[in-house]
């Protein structure tokens, strides 16, 4: 590649910042797009513009959809007595693909660490979760955070936040490997983790 190809360099750099992609994969993507740029780049641009203009965060759970209340939250056959608390939309989608859970969700958006400040705590949207628990008389909260140090710390924080509520709080079973993320687990592992989930007083 010519040293003066700054625009292409910048595009490769942008793709390389995406999760799971490195410089080599980014270069392959850019070269693929350039092979038929009039069609491929225009199509990609149209799709990204559509996402930018139409996709929004669900007011209730934090999922992504084209409406302010996502299809999961407004689905009449979902079990409104149970909410699974997940770290990210990717984790929510992983559980939906596995079809092991039929309740509602709450997307934290991030996790806490030992050095997290008040801004990080506030970003978890726990007051919104608490309002849903009380309004819909939720009976169980399933902590489906990842099996990482930050994920476990976040789970304990949520437990402490909800300790005065009259509901069951459970955690996915330890069959999930240490450091494991829900988005990478197969359906069988997720199903086993849900079936063998433990009440928080056993943690």
From Swiss-Prot:
Domain Toprim: 81-177
Domain of life per record: Bacteria
GO biological process: one example: DNA repair
Molecular-function annotations in GO: DNA binding; zinc ion binding
PROSITE patterns (UniProt xref): RECR (PS01300), TOPRIM (PS50880)
Keywords: DNA damage, DNA recombination, DNA repair, Metal-binding, Zinc, Zinc-finger
Coiled-coil ranges (or none): none
Record flagged with keyword Zinc: yes
Residue spans, zinc finger C4-type: 58-73
Function of the molecule: May play a role in DNA repair. It seems to be involved in an RecBC-independent recombinational process of DNA repair. It may act with RecF and RecO.
Family: Belongs to the RecR family.
Protein name in the entry: Recombination protein RecR
Organism: Orientia tsutsugamushi (strain Ikeda)
Gene that encodes it: recR
